[in-house]
């Protein structure tokens, strides 16, 4: 899966507005849209910070919407479900999403 495809899937699944993502990452909406739809990638210099911020936004939405089980079903091709206590759930989700975003970024940057 490409970076843009995975990002778009996360946005749709969590129903997160692009404006929220733009505010959290500090990037204009047009950049976010290009990442999702045009195959344009963030720079390698900034990707780790962007992925960390994005993963926290999505993990928070998943927990707040009580969609953890749905998330693991919908993203089973990218993220393996592991037993974790509810106290560490946000961190686990955030780390898993960040890792998956990084994998997709590497895959996309070599195409």
Map each language-model feature to its residues.
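Recognition helix of helix-turn-helix/homeodomain-like DNA-binding domains
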Residues: 26-43
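Short amphipathic recognition helices of helix-turn-helix/homeodomain-type DNA-binding modules
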Residues: 46-110
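The alpha-helix within a helix-turn-helix
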Residues: 11, 22, 51, 55
